[in-house]
Amino acid sequence: MSGNPWLQSLESDLEELEAPEQRTPVDRRVDLVPPVAPQPGVVLSRAADRFPRREIYTSLERDTRVWWLGVHGGAGETTLEQLLEGSRAAGHAWPVIAPGEGPAARVVLVARTHARGLRAAQLAAIEWASGDVPVRLEGLVLLADAPGRLPKALKQFSRLVAGGVPRVWELPWVEEWRLGAPVSEDTAPKDVSRLLDHLRTACLVPTSSTNHHPS
């Protein structure tokens, strides 16, 4: 078995979700240092488990400071795009800038905290860690998929996935947005503001007093 817990097979993860009561809960991120770059020895996933790629051609796209890559439908990439000026939803694909056309795109993975979302995030993390994707991964945003606390089995799975990316932000459920309220940092939880502040500093995203609303 690999020394990196997050590199265990997806089958093992599914077994744990199906029968969590048979196992003693453990925090498998103890003493685990999250990777900040692709890791030697990580095997590229099979083709069916890889994400598509979008080539970045226009200057407007190349100037994008942060790309939100939703790893499944409904992950929330377009919602986050509205909250951060200078960012863009990647359309569920790796944004790839041609060699010599500019620095590698900065990417934040986005997933919901249900089992399907966490499995998709794990696949994206493995693909990045293999070194096959020419992007700079900033981290992973885990958006709550429902109100309330995350079930224990999913919480353990989320910790497993978190061990394979540079940084993780966990954002709570926002009922007002679900009911149609404008997506705005002014009405967002503090965890959202902390995420945006970090990216503004790390990725040199301009600060704006203008909020973005759905069209």
Which functions belong to the PLM regions below?
Residues 1-65, 197-203, 207-213:
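Extreme N-terminal, non-catalytic leader segments
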Residues 157-185:
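Beta-strand-loop-alpha "switch" segments that mediate conformational coupling across diverse proteins
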Residues 64-88:
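Glycine-rich phosphate-binding P-loop
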Residues 1, 59-63, 99-104, 134-135, ...:
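Flexible, charged surface loops at secondary-structure boundaries
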Residues 92-113, 125-141:
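Inter-motif core of Ras-like GTPase G domains
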Residues 177-215:
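A cross-taxonomic marker for long C-terminal extensions/tails that follow the last structured domain
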Residues 105-120, 146-150:
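Conserved Switch II/interswitch segment of TRAFAC-class P-loop GTPases
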Residues 122-165:
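Conserved C-terminal guanine-recognition region of P-loop GTPase G domains, centered on the G4
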